[in-house]
Amino acid sequence: MESPGLYTMVCIKDGEYIGTASFGRARIDNCSDSGEIISIYLLPEYIGKGYGIKIMDSVINELRIHEYKDVILYVLEENTRARKFYERYGFELCNDDKEVIIGGKKLTAVRYAIRDIQ
């Protein structure tokens, strides 16, 4: 699927959709040279089996093709499993948190970045 500046990729195993990622141009003004991973999901039974890395590799490669210099993403502060995955992949924590409201609850999302993916 594609809309201007936004792309969605799916991960399929044995004919079953097991994961997805959405990405594109960064949605914040001061990051015009950056791509953003908006979402990345994997069915729970496939977590820890290398599929997350395959999805991330594919997304980073697509962002390179679109000539983005850096990649950013936001993740909920309390999502320690995802944060550890991003850190192992090479993302670094930035000092740019934002408040989000999910289900009527205020939560903090923290920003991560990989610099110079080219």
Could you say what each language-model-derived stretch is?
Residues 1-45, 56-58, 62, 99, ...:
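Acetyl-CoA-dependent GNAT
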